[in-house]
């Protein structure tokens, strides 16, 4: 006997407020029925950790005034993660000399239309794919050997900053490409790409807030 878990996506609206300059009037764009279609977390040396969150909206409208009931009171004092806050792991082993580590989730999302509809009829989702890429200095052949031998790995990224810590873990990951690059007097580098597969009972990616170290 098996069971399935279904998570219903919540929709929301995004209001873009463009301030008028030199006497120009303000403009407002409201996008309704918004659903996130994935994300990409980029971690690189000498940079802040950044995230991209593409989305699809069911409809979009240009307004001449702020929608009734809109409020803009908010307080934001969180401190974003930087490259010095990031540690990458292969299982329990810390990965050394990593320059970049990017984790991408793609749900194969597309907007579907129907005859007679002036807006999106519904948002269709395909099978989610959690992929990654990392690059760094080649100081041994451990990761290259795992690519050549098609060894499954579990990669993690832990970010620990002043406001707390969180982790991204890719379960049952497989390297799909590994490229050593040799050129000039500089260090030999290794670029790796891969995808996490998970199992029918385990997600291919786990994102959580943690206590670290």
Predicted regions and their residues:
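Signature of extracytoplasmic/envelope-associated structural regions
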Residues: 1-213
């Amino acid at each position: 006997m098996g069971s399935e878990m279904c998570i219903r996506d919540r929709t929301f609206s995004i209001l873009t407020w463009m301030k008028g300059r030199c006497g120009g009037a303000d403009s407002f764009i409201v996008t309704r029925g918004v659903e996130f279609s994935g994300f990409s977390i980029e971690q690189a040396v000498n940079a802040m950790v950044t995230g991209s969150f593409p989305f699809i909206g069911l409809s979009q409208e240009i307004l001449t005034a702020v929608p009734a009931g809109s409020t803009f009171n908010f307080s934001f004092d969180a401190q974003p993660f930087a490259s010095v806050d990031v540690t990458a792991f292969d299982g329990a082993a810390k990965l050394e000399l990593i320059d970049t580590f990017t984790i991408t989730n793609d749900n194969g999302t597309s907007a579907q239309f129907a005859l007679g509809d002036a807006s999106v009829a519904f948002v269709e989702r395909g099978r989610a794919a959690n992929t990654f890429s990392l690059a760094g200095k080649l100081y041994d052949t451990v990761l290259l050997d795992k690519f050549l031998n098609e060894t499954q790995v579990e990669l993690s990224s832990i970010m620990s900053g002043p406001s707390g810590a969180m982790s991204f873990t890719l379960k049952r990951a497989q390297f799909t490409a590994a490229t050593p690059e040799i050129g000039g007097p500089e260090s030999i580098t290794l670029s790796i790409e891969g995808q996490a597969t998970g199992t029918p009972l385990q997600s291919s990616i786990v994102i959580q807030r943690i206590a670290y170290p």
